[in-house]
Every structure is written in structure tokens, then in C-alpha cells.
Amino acid sequence: SWCYTAQNRFKTSKDILQDLVDIVSKNGCLLLNVGPKADGTICEEEVKLLTEIGEWMDVNGEAIYDTHPWRVQAEGNTEVVEGMFSEEGRKDFDSTDIRFTCKGDCIYVIPMKQEGEDIIVKSMGEDSKDFHAIITEFSVLGYEERPEYKREADKMIIHAPFVKSDKPVVYRIRMK
């Protein structure tokens, strides 16, 4: 709604962040509306959503702000239903659903969620036509612990069992 509606149904912060990552990976912009009440205040649910989104952006914003699409926009099994009022056909993302952005000497690999399992990145295998760089740093934003990675002919395997999130997770690959 473009204004306050008492019976409004809200997306979760997870859904909004997944939409944001998907849109930015396609070089798009997300328009997020907050409908104020007549007195100018916003309801508690909207404050909660904005706070959760802001906390995620504080950690992962470098993969969003001033980035552009990488050679590969997306990998994964989940079909994204696009267009206005498409929420009814929305399917949950899983850890095979990965988006990519890049900036400067970094590529950001962004699984839409991660539950402790290995992440398989098909477009970053040793034989990939899309990724030829030398990796100088491999990290996961928001964690001090470093993930492990291994490149095989047809894929990169990211091993980070300490990462568990139903929201997008950002791996930063610095390269030369």
C-alpha cells in the first residue's frame, strides 16, 4: 500500500533482502515504500522491517552499493516470478540460488540463504569461461572466520559450516 493500511500484510525482511539482491544483480533498483499514518508515524512492523534491513546492509552493503552485474547474473533452481503483484507465485529460495555483483577488484557471490552446507558455484570452476582471475582474498562479510574454497573443473565449492542464515550471505572474492 502507498499509505497506512491497518490490515496490511508485510513481506519478511528475508524476502525483501532476497528481492533486493536479485534486483541489484540485474542492475536494477528496488523501490521500497513505507506508508505513514495520518500523524506521520510509521507502524511498529515497518520499523522492525527497516531495522532488520538496515542491520543487514550495515554488514553487506558493499555488495549492493555502487556495484554492477558480473558476467553471470544468477545460478540456481528457483524460478523468479517477476512483475507487479507476483508475491502469490513466489517460491522460497534455497542454497543453490546464487546472485553475483562486482565492484573494483571484487566479485560478490551471494547465496540467497545458507544453512551450514557447502555452496556450489558452477560459474567459477577452473574451466569456466567467465572466471579467470587469481584469487588474493576469500572472505564472508560479517564473519571473522575465513571460509574454505576449492576450485574444480566445473565448479567452486565454498565450505563455511559456521555460516547459517535464511537471509542472503555475501562472499567477497578479491582478485588480481
What is the meaning of each model-derived region?
Residues S1-K176:
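Mature catalytic domains of secreted/periplasmic carbohydrate-active enzymes
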